[in-house]
UniProtKB/Swiss-Prot annotation:
Its main location: cytoplasm. Its EC number is 3.1.-.-. Zn(2+) binds at H120, H124, H130. It comes from Oceanobacillus iheyensis (strain DSM 14371 / CIP 107618 / JCM 11309 / KCTC 3954 / HTE831). This is Endoribonuclease YbeY. InterPro entries: MetalPrtase_cat_dom_sf_prd, YbeY, YbeY_CS. Keywords: Cytoplasm, Endonuclease, Hydrolase, Metal-binding, Nuclease, Ribosome biogenesis, rRNA processing, Zinc. NCBIfam families: rRNA maturation RNase YbeY. It is an enzyme of class 3 (hydrolase). GO terms for molecular function: metalloendopeptidase activity; RNA endonuclease activity; zinc ion binding.
C-alpha cells in the first residue's frame, strides 16, 4: 500500500513513520485491502486539527484523529465510470499534541498512541464507525486485534 506521510509539526521521527507504515500495511492485509491502495497520513498540531474539527464536524475543540474517506458516496454524487486509477482510500489527520497528551493520560508509549490513532483512522476509511454501541464494540475490538497481532501493546 502506498502511504504519503506529511509531518507539518516536524516532530515525528522516521522510526515512528516506519512503524506506522508497517502497521497500516499489516492492517490493510488483515482487512483484505489491495496492495495498490493509497492513502495519506498527516501529522498536525492541536491548532490545525481544531480548525478541521470545527469546519468538518462542527466541534470547536482539538481532537486526536480525523479521517476523510474518499470511497464514501452519497446520493447526490455521480459515479465515475471507467475510473482506472488506484484505489485512493483517503486521508488520516493525527494531532501529535493530542497523541502526546493521551500517551501520558493512558500511561503508554507515544509509539502505541500513534499506532492506535493510525489504525483507528484507517478503519474509519474502510467504513468502520462508532456512532452506535454495537458498531463501537466491533470497531474497537478490531483495533485491539490488529494492534495486538502486530505487537503494539499497551
Amino acid at each position: 500500500m502506498h502511504i504519503d506521510f506529511h509531518d507539518e509539526t516536524n516532530s515525528v521521527s522516521e522510526d515512528y513513520i516506519d512503524l506506522i507504515q508497517r502497521l497500516l500495511d499489516f492492517a490493510a492485509q488483515k482487512e483484505g485491502v489491495t496492495s495498490e491502495a493509497e492513502l495519506s497520513v498527516n501529522f498536525v498540531d492541536n491548532k490545525e486539527i481544531q480548525v478541521l474539527n470545527r469546519n468538518y464536524r462542527q466541534k470547536d475543540t482539538p481532537t486526536d484523529v480525523i479521517s476523510f474517506a474518499m470511497q464514501e458516496s452519497n446520493e447526490d454524487e455521480m459515479e465515475i465510470i471507467g475510473a482506472d486509477g488506484p484505489l485512493v482510500l483517503g486521508d488520516i489527520v493525527i494531532s501529535v499534541d493530542k497523541a502526546k497528551e493521551q500517551s501520558i493520560e493512558y500511561d503508554h508509549s507515544l509509539e502505541r498512541e500513534l499506532g492506535f490513532l493510525a489504525v483507528h483512522g484507517f478503519l474509519h476509511l474502510l467504513g468502520y464507525d462508532h456512532m452506535k454501541e454495537e458498531d463501537e464494540k466491533k470497531m474497537f475490538s478490531r483495533q485491539e486485534e490488529i494492534l495486538g497481532e502486530f505487537g503494539v501493546e499497551r
